[in-house]
């Protein structure tokens, strides 16, 4: 097929991030300069974000058989770029204290965000697999970036081995789907399923294996075992990327797959996904109750959040509202996670060994960093789904979608899970206002709010509050992303 100027405009975010990768590589080869490479990375990601406006002007189109650029792709590309931008911003002060090579960090984040953009635009199982690998491979290096720390290296090895196993399940599942349907395009799969092929054992086995592979990447129960250890072992800025960009991109492509190929029409698939969602919500919240490490706590909480999102995915066939619910929920989850992990990154910067991730490190934070404590409180309330925060709007949407689709047992799980979650989120929030320990541990810099990372954290908190009270701009944006399907 012929690539026209319109196609190139539609691919602008992908091309800009790809070009930034090349520029940063050449810059590292020419001269190692931490500030220069960080600046180039941030400029590239910002340029890719701005280019989305031009992509919108070009309209929806199939660029290649592998990729479709439309409003849906633009929304998820934007969320991935925001998460990547925040990761680079949080990483800069952290890397200032890091004595080994600093510049490769940005290179790995850029390559991973390239994978995220590919996933957001994927319209074919081959693009889905390439995107997942492109986002996973740089994460092996990023998780083990503080390789002199035993925990970081252990987390990287654990993630690498389990990720390879999950990828093999995913690939074998795709092979079975191809053997039965003869096509890997989402639209062609939809036609095959529409022809009554959905109940073929080979096709169901293929989708079952794909659910195993994707369940690992999204850290859903029972494929979640890596999550708390990897979140704890990875440097704080990397945990930010893991919790946001990789989850959002992969969930976005799963949404598109389910939209084109109505796999959820199969009762067997719906029951399996329902059990996974139920187990993820309950188990994730119960395990977070006893955590004293804030990164492990956020790791378990991310399992439950993906469980909530799965409820909206199961309800996808019952109306467009579930697409809206996922868009709003993911935006709320993104800003809340960026704020929470941003505070951990600020407290852990510059690099001085293990991160400040013990709950004890945050005890009495209000008495010497009141604004930072207030930001962390807002993020905890949003993740808990308290009214007047963006997290509440997302959770309300998920409940509404569950009720609309008559998924009563999953609605009950969401309510019970939210009640359990309230306890451990408030436990973190309350500890910020207790008496500070006699010997204070790690602390954020006194001028943290003037740093780039501090500004990102403050903007996240502001968005969580403003969009929690007045969500209409976000809802309108998400609705704009839907008709172009």
Swiss-Prot record:
<protein>
    <recommendedName>
        <fullName>NADH-quinone oxidoreductase subunit N</fullName>
        <ecNumber>7.1.1.-</ecNumber>
    </recommendedName>
</protein>
<feature type="transmembrane region" description="Helical">
    <location>
        <begin position="297"/>
        <end position="317"/>
    </location>
</feature>
<dbReference type="InterPro" id="IPR010096">
    <property type="entry name" value="NADH-Q_OxRdtase_suN/2"/>
</dbReference>
<keyword id="KW-0830">Ubiquinone</keyword>
<feature type="transmembrane region" description="Helical">
    <location>
        <begin position="203"/>
        <end position="223"/>
    </location>
</feature>
<feature type="transmembrane region" description="Helical">
    <location>
        <begin position="35"/>
        <end position="55"/>
    </location>
</feature>
<keyword id="KW-1133">Transmembrane helix</keyword>
<keyword id="KW-0812">Transmembrane</keyword>
<feature type="transmembrane region" description="Helical">
    <location>
        <begin position="235"/>
        <end position="255"/>
    </location>
</feature>
<keyword id="KW-0874">Quinone</keyword>
<comment type="similarity">
    <text>Belongs to the complex I subunit 2 family.</text>
</comment>
<feature type="transmembrane region" description="Helical">
    <location>
        <begin position="408"/>
        <end position="430"/>
    </location>
</feature>
<feature type="transmembrane region" description="Helical">
    <location>
        <begin position="159"/>
        <end position="179"/>
    </location>
</feature>
<feature type="transmembrane region" description="Helical">
    <location>
        <begin position="127"/>
        <end position="147"/>
    </location>
</feature>
<keyword id="KW-0520">NAD</keyword>
<dbReference type="GO" id="GO:0042773">
    <property type="term" value="P:ATP synthesis coupled electron transport"/>
</dbReference>
<dbReference type="GO" id="GO:0005886">
    <property type="term" value="C:plasma membrane"/>
</dbReference>
<feature type="transmembrane region" description="Helical">
    <location>
        <begin position="455"/>
        <end position="475"/>
    </location>
</feature>
<dbReference type="Pfam" id="PF00361">
    <property type="entry name" value="Proton_antipo_M"/>
</dbReference>
<keyword id="KW-0997">Cell inner membrane</keyword>
<feature type="transmembrane region" description="Helical">
    <location>
        <begin position="71"/>
        <end position="91"/>
    </location>
</feature>
<feature type="transmembrane region" description="Helical">
    <location>
        <begin position="105"/>
        <end position="125"/>
    </location>
</feature>
<feature type="transmembrane region" description="Helical">
    <location>
        <begin position="326"/>
        <end position="346"/>
    </location>
</feature>
<dbReference type="GO" id="GO:0048038">
    <property type="term" value="F:quinone binding"/>
</dbReference>
<keyword id="KW-1278">Translocase</keyword>
<comment type="subunit">
    <text>NDH-1 is composed of 13 different subunits. Subunits NuoA, H, J, K, L, M, N constitute the membrane sector of the complex.</text>
</comment>
<feature type="transmembrane region" description="Helical">
    <location>
        <begin position="8"/>
        <end position="28"/>
    </location>
</feature>
<keyword id="KW-0472">Membrane</keyword>
<feature type="transmembrane region" description="Helical">
    <location>
        <begin position="373"/>
        <end position="393"/>
    </location>
</feature>
<dbReference type="GO" id="GO:0008137">
    <property type="term" value="F:NADH dehydrogenase (ubiquinone) activity"/>
</dbReference>
<feature type="transmembrane region" description="Helical">
    <location>
        <begin position="271"/>
        <end position="291"/>
    </location>
</feature>
<keyword id="KW-1003">Cell membrane</keyword>
<dbReference type="GO" id="GO:0050136">
    <property type="term" value="F:NADH:ubiquinone reductase (non-electrogenic) activity"/>
</dbReference>
<dbReference type="InterPro" id="IPR001750">
    <property type="entry name" value="ND/Mrp_TM"/>
</dbReference>
<comment type="function">
    <text>NDH-1 shuttles electrons from NADH, via FMN and iron-sulfur (Fe-S) centers, to quinones in the respiratory chain. The immediate electron acceptor for the enzyme in this species is believed to be ubiquinone. Couples the redox reaction to proton translocation (for every two electrons transferred, four hydrogen ions are translocated across the cytoplasmic membrane), and thus conserves the redox energy in a proton gradient.</text>
</comment>
<keyword id="KW-0813">Transport</keyword>
């Amino acid at each position: 097929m012929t690539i026209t100027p319109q196609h190139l405009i539609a691919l602008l975010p992908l091309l800009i991030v790809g070009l930034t990768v090349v520029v940063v590589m050449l810059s590292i080869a020419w001269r190692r300069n931490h500030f220069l490479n960080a600046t180039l990375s941030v400029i590239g990601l910002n340029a890719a974000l701005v280019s989305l406006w031009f992509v919108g002007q070009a309209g929806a189109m199939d660029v290649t058989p592998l990729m479709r650029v439309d409003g849906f792709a633009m929304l998820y590309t934007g969320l991935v770029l925001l998460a990547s931008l925040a990761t680079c911003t949080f990483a800069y002060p952290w890397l200032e204290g890091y004595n080994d090579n600093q510049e490769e960090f940005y290179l790995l984040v850029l390559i991973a965000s390239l994978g995220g953009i590919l996933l957001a635009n994927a319209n074919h199982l081959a693009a889905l697999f390439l995107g997942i690998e492109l986002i996973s491979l740089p994460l092996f290096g990023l998780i083990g970036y503080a390789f002199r720390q035993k925990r970081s290296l252990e987390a990287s090895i654990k993630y690498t081995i389990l990720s390879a196993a999950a990828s093999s399940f995913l690939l074998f599942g795709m092979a079975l789907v191809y053997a039965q349907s003869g096509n890997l395009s989402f639209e062609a799969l939809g036609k095959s399923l529409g022809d009554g092929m959905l109940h073929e054992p080979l096709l169901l086995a293929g989708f079952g294996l794909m659910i195993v592979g994707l369940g690992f990447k999204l850290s859903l129960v029972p494929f979640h075992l890596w999550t708390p250890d990897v979140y704890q072992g990875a440097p704080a800025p990397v945990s930010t990327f893991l919790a946001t960009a990789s989850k959002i991109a992969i969930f976005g492509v799963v949404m598109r797959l389910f939209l084109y190929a109505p796999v959820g029409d199969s009762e067997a698939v719906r029951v399996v996904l329902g059990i996974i969602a139920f187990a993820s919500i309950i188990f994730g919240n119960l395990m977070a109750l006893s955590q004293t490490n804030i990164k492990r706590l956020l790791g378990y909480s991310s399992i439950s959040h993906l469980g909530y999102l799965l409820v909206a995915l199961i309800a996808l066939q019952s109306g467009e509202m579930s697409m809206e619910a996922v868009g709003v929920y993911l935006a709320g989850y993104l800003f809340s996670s960026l704020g929470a992990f941003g505070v951990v990154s600020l407290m852990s910067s510059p690099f001085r060994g293990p991160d400040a991730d013990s709950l004890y490190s945050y005890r009495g934070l209000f008495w010497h960093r009141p604004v930072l404590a207030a930001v962390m409180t807002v993020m905890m309330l949003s993740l808990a789904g308290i009214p007047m925060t963006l997290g509440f709007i997302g959770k309300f949407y998920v409940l509404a979608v569950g009720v609309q689709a008559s998924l009563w047992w999953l609605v009950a799980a969401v309510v019970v899970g939210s009640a359990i979650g309230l306890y451990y989120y408030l436990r973190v929030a309350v500890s910020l206002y207790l008496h500070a320990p006699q010997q204070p541990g790690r602390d954020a810099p006194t001028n943290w709010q003037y740093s780039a990372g501090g500004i990102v954290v403050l903007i996240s908190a502001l968005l969580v509050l403003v969009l929690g009270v007045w969500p209409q701009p976000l809802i309108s944006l998400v609705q704009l992303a839907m008709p172009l399907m």
